[in-house]
């Protein structure tokens, strides 16, 4: 019952968060951007090292989360801006595929390295709370746009 209450509270929070921003109904042509595999692995390692330094578990890589992180990074590249558009749908889809009770994500742009993205998240209380949250799995997508700018999506779940 407690988990169900927490899940309902999370869904309500996401709905309220989503209602604060307007989502465009325009059609966007999504072109798959190239992944920066080294940056993705480095960011995953830095986040896990940070968690371990706090006495927390290292997060396991999830190919399901990676699929959704990639799709969202492609979407952000196509829009030219970072956002959490359609997060509630992503979270619901991931939850149904892996039976997750909680899903969260961090996004970033305008960082050249994984370390810079990590530091940016660490200096934001909400992003830091997500990185340090009680999660078991994650995946990081880092994609470059045509100008070489990196867009990051990290999805967490338990």
PLM ranges: what are they?
Residues 1-8:
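Bacterial N-terminal signal peptides that target proteins for export
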Residues 10-14:
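Hydrophobic helical h-region of N-terminal Sec-dependent signal peptides
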Residues 15-19:
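C-terminal motif of bacterial Sec signal peptides marking the signal peptidase cleavage site
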Residues 23-77:
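A short alpha-helix/helix-coil micro-patch that ends at or immediately precedes a cysteine
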Residues 41-49, 67-74, 105, 115-120, ...:
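Solvent-exposed, polar/charged alpha-helical surfaces in well-ordered, non-transmembrane soluble domains
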Residues 53-67, 80-91, 128-143:
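Surface-exposed patches in mature extracellular/periplasmic domains of secreted proteins
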Residues 70-114:
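Short, surface-exposed glycine/acidic/tryptophan-bearing loops
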Residues 108-158:
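Disulfide-stabilized extracellular recognition modules
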């Amino acid at each position: 019952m407690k988990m169900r209450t927490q899940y309902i509270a999370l869904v309500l929070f996401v709905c309220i968060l989503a209602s604060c921003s307007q989502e465009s109904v325009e059609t966007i042509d999504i072109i798959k951007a190239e992944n920066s595999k080294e940056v993705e692995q480095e960011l995953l390692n830095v986040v896990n090292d940070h968690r371990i330094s706090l006495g927390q578990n290292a997060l396991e890589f999830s190919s399901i989360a990676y699929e959704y992180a990639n799709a969202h990074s492609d979407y952000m590249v196509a829009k030219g801006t970072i956002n959490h558009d359609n997060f509630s749908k992503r979270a619901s889809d991931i939850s149904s595929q892996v039976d997750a009770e909680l899903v969260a994500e961090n996004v970033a742009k305008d960082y050249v390295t994984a370390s810079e993205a990590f530091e940016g998240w660490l200096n934001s209380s909400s992003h830091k709370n997500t990185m340090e949250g009680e999660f078991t799995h994650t995946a990081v997508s880092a994609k470059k746009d045509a100008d070489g700018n990196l867009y990051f999506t990290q999805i967490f779940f338990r």
